[in-house]
Amino acid sequence: KLYQDYPALYEYDDTPDGFEWINHIEAEKNMLTFLRKAEKKADTLVVVCNFSDLAYEAYAMGVPYAGEYREIFNSDDESFGGTGVKNSGVQKAKKEEKDERPYSIEIQVAPLSVQIFSVKECGEKMVKESKVRRELEKKIKEEHKKEENRR
């Protein structure tokens, strides 16, 4: 059901356009955070993977859009035999840069878990900023490829 209800989990499965790192270098916390993207920016999902047995009560992470983020999946839910650490309600994005993103949210992160958040009220300005960011990332990758070919 989760997979069917959220286009970001399937729309761009066969292309890199459906994935974007938020932070892949939190080695000291054993955590990875990334985006799953779809054709509509409002369908973007934020995925938090905690490979540590530690919970974090106030984990700040960068997000691409203004708006409200709601936890839609938590592998640590008590119904799955987890500890029940969860984010109830919504987490409103603050205009505080984090992880090279213009906004951030503060969440509770469950131990040994995967948590997925959907975004609501994604502003048009943020959609444009995200598009510009993707274009810049694409140019950087092309430059790196050219540099490698010269060697």
Which residue ranges define each predicted feature?
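Carbohydrate-interacting/catalytic domains
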Residues: K1-R151
